[in-house]
Amino acid sequence: MEDKKKFMAKAIELSINSANTIGGPFGSVIVKDNEIIAEGSNKVTSSNDPTAHGEVVAIREACKKLNTFDLSGCEIYTSCEPCPMCLSAIYWSRLDKIYYANTREDAKKIDFDDSFIYLEIPKKIGDR
């Protein structure tokens, strides 16, 4: 349990640093064999890339480091509940587990509201 707290603390530290410097308040770490192998923080505004969320940045780094798209055997710790895009990337990369500190409701309170996406998903394509 102590390691899980350490990994989450690192994700939160990345989110704080990101909010104070280059982007939104989101950070993530990917862990394999009880070691951090990749880190990511929100770089949407600094890179002009709307997909550069902390989770996606960490996934890209881990895939590059391990030279594979399959992150089975790895876990992700993230400062906030993943948005639909990040959750999809987590599933596609086959990460074993997700741990998050804040909920999407917490994110909504600080103007990071993705509830409109969740409302769109169940709609028929013609109604989107």
Predicted regions and their residues:
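Short, basic/aromatic recognition patches
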Residues: 1-21
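Small-residue (primarily alanine) positions within well-ordered alpha-helices
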Residues: 11, 15-18, 28, 38, ...
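Exposed boundary/loop context
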Residues: 17-20, 33, 47, 101
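Short beta-strand scaffold segments in enzyme catalytic cores
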Residues: 26-34
